[in-house]
Regions:
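Alpha-helix N-cap/helix-start capping motif
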Residues: 18, 43-44, 72, 93, ...
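General small-molecule cofactor/ligand-binding pocket signal
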Residues: 39-41, 88-90, 218
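Active-site substrate-recognition segment that forms the wall
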Residues: 1-5, 95-106, 113-224
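Short aromatic/hydrophobic contact patches that present stacked aromatics
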Residues: 11-13, 60-62, 148, 168
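Helical element adjacent to the flavin cofactor pocket in flavoenzyme catalytic cores
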Residues: 22-34, 53-119
Length: 224
């Protein structure tokens, strides 16, 4: 194994209003149906689980089996493990075409030469439909753009990963930093950056956790 910051303390969905709390109460029945542990918590119980929250919250839902990781450490760790087991990683290499023989793909043409393999897996995420067109295949994937903002040394550091119901934002503690993630834009392969989305996420989060609107931003990310 390898260390990637895993903590399995659960997660807490937080509501500011009674309307949101009632909506989550109705949805929790689905979790019960699939035997996924989840429990409604009132304001005092939520603050007991996560003292960093503002006392103006109404309550929420606690998911005891949830956990958190540091995504970068996880991906880097996987790459290092794979390399140690003999895998070859071709970074900064773009697939630009294929060669096939009798209905089987035998080679991948890349910006750094050809790669030959017995089996080829297409796992290009949002780019899969574009790559698959070269094979006359239709892959039903729709790109969805999301954003994250990482702030340094926030005024408070939550114990748990948090989900903010009304703001539709997720909070992941990362040591001396805090990552705020959310939004979903269905805009095709659009890599443009919308600063209003980022500001809205940060400002909305400040209604649940103190001081986030003024916290120092060290990274803004968007991806498909």
């Amino acid at each position: 194994g390898f260390e990637f910051g895993f903590e399995g303390k659960g997660s807490l969905l937080v509501c500011l209003t009674r309307q949101a709390l009632e909506k989550e109460r109705r949805e929790i029945r689905l979790f019960e149906e699939f035997k996924i542990p989840a429990s409604m918590v009132n304001r005092d119980e939520a603050l007991g689980l996560e003292p960093a929250l503002l006392p103006s919250i109404m309550g929420g839902v606690y998911y005891p089996r949830d956990g958190r990781i540091d995504p970068r450490r996880f991906v880097v760790g996987l790459a290092e493990k794979a390399s140690g087991l003999g895998a070859q990683l071709h970074t900064k290499t773009e697939a630009i075409g294929f060669e096939s023989n009798r209905g089987r793909v035998t080679k991948v043409r890349t910006t750094r030469g050809e790669l030959t393999a017995n089996q080829i897996i297409l796992a290009s995420g949002s780019w899969s439909p574009q790559v698959a067109r070269a094979l006359k295949l239709r892959v039903p994937i729709q790109p969805a753009k999301g954003y994250s903002v990482t702030v340094e040394n926030p005024p408070v550091t939550p114990r748990l990963p948090l989900l903010f119901s009304e703001a539709r934002v997720v909070i992941n503690p990362l040591g001396h930093a805090l990552r705020i993630a959310g939004t979903l834009e269905l805009a095709g392969m659009d890599f443009s950056f919308n600063p209003r989305r980022v500001a809205a996420m940060q400002n909305a989060s400040a209604e649940y956790l103190p001081g986030l609107a003024e916290a120092k931003v060290i990274e803004i990310w968007r991806g498909l």
